[in-house]
C-alpha cells in the first residue's frame, strides 16, 4: 500500500516477514528513493511505533514528522515504545507525552 504523505513523499507498507519479528514495516520514499523506514505494530485497539529511522543524509527535512502526522490522522491511540533519550524532544514536539521513562503516548 502506497500512501502519499507529502510532496513527493510516500509511505509504503511492506508485508510482515516472520523472520523480522511481529512488526509492520513501512518504507519512507521521496520521489522513488528510500529515505527511511518505520517499525510499528498495528493492532485493533492501538498503534505502536518502535522506531522511525530517517537516513542521515535526509534528516532535517520533516520526513519523520510527516510519517507521524499520517499515523496521527489514521489512528486514535499511538504508543511510541522504547523511546531513546535523544529522541524524547522529537516525540514531545509532535504531541506525545511520557507515561513511563521510555514510552510516549499520543491520543486524539
Stretches with model-predicted labels:
Residues 1-14:
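Conserved N-terminal entry element of GNAT/NAT acetyltransferase domains
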Residues 16, 21-36:
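Conserved beta-hairpin
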Residues 45-56:
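Conserved acetyl-CoA binding element of GNAT-fold acetyltransferases
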Residues 54, 60-73:
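Conserved acetyl-CoA-binding loop-helix of GNAT-fold acetyltransferases
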Residues 73-86:
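Conserved GNAT acetyl-CoA-binding A-motif
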Residues 79-81, 97-108:
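Conserved catalytic-core motifs of GNAT/GCN5-like acyltransferases
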Residues 91, 96:
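Conserved active-site tyrosine of GNAT-family acetyltransferases
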Amino acid at each position: 500500500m502506497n500512501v502519499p504523505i507529502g510532496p513527493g513523499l510516500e509511505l509504503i507498507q511492506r508485508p510482515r516477514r516472520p523472520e523480522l519479528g511481529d512488526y509492520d514495516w513501512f518504507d519512507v520514499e521521496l520521489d522513488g528513493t528510500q529515505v527511511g523506514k518505520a517499525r510499528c505494530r498495528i493492532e485493533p485497539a492501538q498503534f505502536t511505533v518502535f522506531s522511525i529511522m530517517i537516513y542521515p543524509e535526509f534528516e532535517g527535512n520533516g520526513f519523520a514528522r510527516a510519517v507521524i502526522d499520517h499515523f496521527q490522522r489514521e489512528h486514535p491511540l499511538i504508543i511510541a515504545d522504547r523511546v531513546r533519550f535523544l529522541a524524547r524532544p522529537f516525540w514531545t514536539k509532535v504531541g506525545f507525552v511520557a507515561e513511563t521513562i521510555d514510552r510516549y503516548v499520543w491520543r486524539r
